């Protein structure tokens, strides 16, 4: 039908643009009319360091690591756990267990008192061996197996400095889809609390886009 032909032409125009500009990527339709997904073809598979701050809450950390091990199909990665003054024995027992079974995991110790998320992550980054760093909370669980390839495709572009991913609460509502300066005051998260299926303004929530910040 006519709309199908229009979508095919729109999709092909993006492909042609990539060819003219020397960008190695494929383009595919999404379930949303007028929104297309570009997949950048990785010429190399660089080491990605996944920095995870942790203080006790070992059950959350286990779920996080297990989801990475079971669902993430990007193999060239390492885990840098930043231990932040935990007190429970089972936390340190898990660290020992993780290091024994996973050669790509390491635990470093942050000994300052008090909580400063930025300083703890920056400290962990000093021990990262990877060319790219993924900062991840210990209560995060991975949903898509190709999320690292997807993020790397954008990270490896010369005009991109930082990349974020959509995050969802357990009930399927949106936790994070970027930050917009001036929204609701100084800055805020657009679509926070909305169902993941929400269409939003012109379907923007379902498209890769530039934002003021990511977290």
What residues fall within each predicted segment?
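Conserved donor NDP-sugar-binding/catalytic core segment of glycosyltransferases
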Residues: 140-186
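Nucleotide-sugar-dependent glycosyltransferase catalytic core
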Residues: 1-12, 174-180, 184
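N-proximal low-complexity "stem/linker" segments adjacent to membrane-targeting elements
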Residues: 15-70
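Acidic donor-binding segment of Leloir-type glycosyltransferases
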Residues: 69-113
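Short aromatic/hydrophobic "clamp" motif used to bind/position activated sugar donors
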Residues: 133
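Active-site acidic Asp-centered loop
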Residues: 84, 136-139
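A recurrent flexible, glycine/aromatic-enriched loop bordering the glycosyltransferase active site
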Residues: 118-119, 126, 174, 180-215
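A short, glycine-/small-residue-rich helix N-cap motif at loop->alpha-helix starts
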Residues: 112-119, 125-128, 142-143
């Amino acid at each position: 039908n006519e709309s199908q032909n229009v979508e095919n032409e729109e999709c092909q125009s993006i492909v042609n643009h990539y060819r003219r500009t020397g960008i190695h990527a494929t383009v595919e339709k999404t379930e949303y009319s007028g929104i297309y997904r570009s997949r950048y073809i990785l010429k190399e598979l660089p080491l990605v360091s996944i920095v995870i701050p942790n203080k006790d809450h070992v059950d959350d950390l286990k779920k996080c690591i297990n989801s990475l091990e079971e669902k993430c199909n990007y193999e060239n990665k390492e885990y840098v756990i930043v231990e932040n003054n935990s007190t429970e024995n089972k936390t340190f027992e898990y660290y020992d267990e993780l290091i024994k079974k996973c050669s790509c995991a390491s635990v470093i110790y942050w000994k300052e008192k008090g909580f400063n998320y930025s300083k703890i992550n920056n400290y962990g980054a000093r021990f990262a061996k990877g060319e790219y760093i993924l900062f991840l909370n210990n209560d995060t669980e991975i949903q898509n197996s190709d999320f690292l390839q997807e993020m790397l495709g954008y990270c490896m572009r010369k005009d991109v400095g930082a990349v974020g991913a959509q995050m969802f609460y357990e009930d399927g509502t949106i936790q994070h889809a970027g930050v917009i300066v001036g929204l609701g005051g100084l800055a805020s998260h657009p679509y926070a609390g909305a169902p993941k299926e929400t269409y939003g303004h012109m379907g923007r929530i379902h498209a890769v886009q530039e934002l003021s910040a990511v977290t």
